[in-house]
């Protein structure tokens, strides 16, 4: 469950290390974002010479949450940290590599590029 002011790790090589959620997109008063949802983020920590800079505002898709996601068979997939992948204006990933596992639910959300770049799909 990601909400405004939540700080997330970045799971790609866009140059950002930590981002903070400033808005959950989809609905007028939507409060929480789960895996596969798009959020607006601001970069709080970035590496030198990266594609994004500290203070930049971008869209991101949530790929891992501590809350997890429930499957139809009753299984729950949870992670140790919250993480997101930075997106450009066309909702395509900014980075060219994805770090860490992602869930199969991203396949349904039209993020096949992220699923194909990920080293592990749960």
Curated annotation (Swiss-Prot):
InterPro entries, per database record: Ribosomal_uL14, Ribosomal_uL14_bac-type, Ribosomal_uL14_sf
On the tree of life, the source organism's domain of life is Bacteria
GO MF, one term, reads: structural constituent of ribosome
Q: Which UniProt keywords apply?
A: Ribonucleoprotein, Ribosomal protein, RNA-binding, rRNA-binding
What parts of the sequence cross the membrane? Answer: none
Q: Which GO terms describe its cellular component?
A: cytosolic large ribosomal subunit
Q: Which family does it belong to?
A: Belongs to the universal ribosomal protein uL14 family.
The UniProt function text for this chain reads: Binds to 23S rRNA. Forms part of two intersubunit bridges in the 70S ribosome.
Give the record's subunit note. Part of the 50S ribosomal subunit. Forms a cluster with proteins L3 and L19. In the 70S ribosome, L14 and L19 interact and together make contacts with the 16S rRNA in bridges B5 and B8.
Annotated protein name in UniProt: Large ribosomal subunit protein uL14
Species per Swiss-Prot/TrEMBL record = Psychromonas ingrahamii (strain DSM 17664 / CCUG 51855 / 37)
